[in-house]
Regions:
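Ligand-binding clefts/hinges and TM-proximal coupling segments of bilobed small-molecule sensing domains
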Residues: 62, 138-155, 191-196, 223-246
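Flexible hinge/capping segments at coil-to-helix
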Residues: 114-131
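A ligand-binding cleft/hinge motif common to bilobed small-molecule-binding domains
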Residues: 72-75, 87-97, 142-145, 171-202
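Extracytoplasmic small-molecule ligand-binding "clamshell" domains
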Residues: 22-88, 97
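Short helix-initiation/N-cap motifs at beta->coil->alpha
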Residues: 49, 65-75, 118, 138, ...
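Periplasmic-binding protein-like
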Residues: 30, 106-114, 177, 181, ...
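Sec/Tat signal peptide C-region and signal peptidase I cleavage site
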Residues: 17-21
């Protein structure tokens, strides 16, 4: 009986730690379907949104979600305006110097979208073309690093890049492959206009991003992610939002 009481008290102490007691603010840029976006009623939804809500259940966390602009999202986290980023945030060495990341919850590659039927063999084929992307995402970094002579046009919202592509004001868009496939295959207003012309070979991985030193919170998130991967919940979310668990 004493042992059972001790275990119960330990569990209660864990549940009443500061992380469990307060409501955590989760931020994301809801302009990146199918990962994070808004419904017609302006409700945040998508793969990352479903994922972080399931994490919260498993980790005994109270969360509220805030839609914020991508430009400045890291500054807001550093300033304490929110506690977690759930925004298709690629884990990079540069970002890891300033922030902590969970274990990966999704793997992506960069994709180039062009008018229907067009294909390219490498980023080098974008030489002389105008390529749209969103400010500060890894697609911009990848294209700049490749230095192929493309003109990069950056937008506040990836959707605006696709609108310009549809209107013929640009030649291509580069972004993460789930987003590229969504705009090429699932957006009714762009039906039949685009195709994924190229998939870059280098993989990148998304993690939930936190301020340095949030050790307890990081451990809770990682434990929940690992359990979701082990019991098939992650795969089910991939099928729901991307159509495949691959």
């Amino acid at each position: 009986m004493i042992r059972k009481l001790t275990l119960t008290l330990c569990a209660l102490v864990l549940m009443c730690t500061p992380v469990a007691a307060k409501t955590l603010v989760v931020a994301g840029n809801c302009a990146f379907p199918p990962m994070e976006f808004l419904t017609d009623k302006k409700v945040p939804t998508g793969y990352s949104i479903d994922y972080i809500h399931e994490i919260a259940k498993r980790a005994n966390l109270k969360i509220t979600f805030r839609d914020v602009a991508w430009d400045g999202i890291f500054a807001g986290l550093a300033a304490g305006n929110y506690d977690i980023l759930a925004s298709s945030t690629t884990i990079t060495p540069e970002r890891q110097q300033a922030f902590d990341f969970t274990i990966p919850y999704y793997g992506a590659v960069q994709a180039v979208v062009m008018p229907k039927g067009k294909k390219i063999d490498s980023l080098a084929d974008l030489k002389g073309l105008t390529v749209g992307s969103q400010i500060g995402i890894t697609g911009v970094f990848v294209l700049r690093k490749a230095d192929v002579g493309a003109k990069i046009k950056e937008y506040d919202d990836i959707g605006l890049a696709f609108e310009d592509l549809a209107a013929g004001r640009t030649d291509a868009v580069i972004c993460d492959d789930p987003v590229a496939k969504f705009y090429a295959n699932k957006r009714e207003d762009f039906a039949g206009k685009f195709s994924v012309a190229y998939l870059h070979k280098d993989p990148e991985y998304y993690g939930f991003c936190l301020r340095k030193g949030e050790t307890e919170l990081l451990e809770r998130l990682n434990k929940a992610i690992a359990s979701m991967q082990a019991d098939g919940t992650e795969a089910k979310l991939k099928i729901k939002w991307m159509g495949s668990a691959d």
